Design a protein with these regions (language model features):
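Non-heme di-metal
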Residues: 2-245
Length: 245
């Protein structure tokens, strides 16, 4: 590896290359979800397990917020908490995800309890929260850059699920509409911070490694779902069991 610092354009190209290879829109479970190949119970398993990820994002963001050294940075990052937790009960991304889970036929209290999630889901999400808590601020912010690729997966997911699943409506998928504007805003902040603070090639490599780690977090959640609910279909003890189709 050369010690030469990458230009902003070169760094973005390297980040995009990671997404093109590793982002979870490429996972077989997501391909099946978007192509209408899953039964309702499998869609429920996805919504249930994804809730744990959604519910821990505000905790992850609050952990980083406490570490940011300036008021300007804290104000910018605080908007993520508002996006996910909302400013009142029933608002924000977590509440909208609960609405999605109810829309595909799950009981709200059961989803909120997280009692039925897969161990692999819990381990992956908790590892992400710990990463943001324990690694450098630069790496923590860089790990959020999977949002660079989220508009593509949102478009695929919304169009595919509406086309293939009669139990899914536009209202069910309301979570995704605000993300189309929130995610680019968050990406702009993260890239600006990285351009200013990743001043050496070694720091830039840390940025790239953080994005790879986050892609692994997302991919491993889908590995767990695929193993439990698709092939070979071995659901761990205590995890959600769909009703027979």
């Amino acid at each position: 590896m050369s010690d030469r610092r990458l230009s902003p354009t070169e760094l973005r190209d390297a980040l995009n290359a990671i997404g093109a290879e590793r982002y979870h829109n490429l996972h077989p479970f997501h391909r099946a979800l978007h192509d209408g190949a899953l039964a309702q119970g499998q869609v429920q398993a996805w919504a249930l397990n994804r809730y744990y990820y959604q519910s821990r994002i505000p905790a992850k963001d609050a952990t980083l917020l406490a570490r940011l050294p300036t008021a300007d940075l804290r104000r910018a990052w605080r908007s993520r908490l508002d996006d996910h937790d909302g400013s009142a009960p029933g608002q924000g991304g977590v509440a909208r995800w609960l609405k999605l889970a109810e829309g595909v036929g799950l009981d709200r209290a059961y989803v909120e309890s997280t009692a039925g999630i897969l161990p692999g889901t819990r381990f992956a999400v908790d590892a992400y929260v710990a990463f943001v808590r324990d690694r450098s601020i630069l790496e923590a912010i860089a790990s959020s850059l999977t949002e660079m690729f989220s508009p593509t997966i949102i478009a695929e997911r919304v169009s595919g699920m509406l086309a293939h699943y009669p139990f899914v409506t536009q209202d069910t998928l309301a979570y995704f509409t605000p993300r189309l504007t929130q995610a680019p805003k968050d990406v702009d902040f993260a890239l600006t911070y990285i351009d200013e603070h990743a001043r050496t090639r070694a720091l830039q490599e840390g940025v790239l490694a953080a994005l790879r780690f986050k892609c692994d977090v997302l991919w491993s959640q889908l590995d767990a779902l695929h193993y439990a609910y698709v092939e070979p279909g071995r659901i761990p003890p205590g995890a959600f069991v769909p009703e027979p189709a």
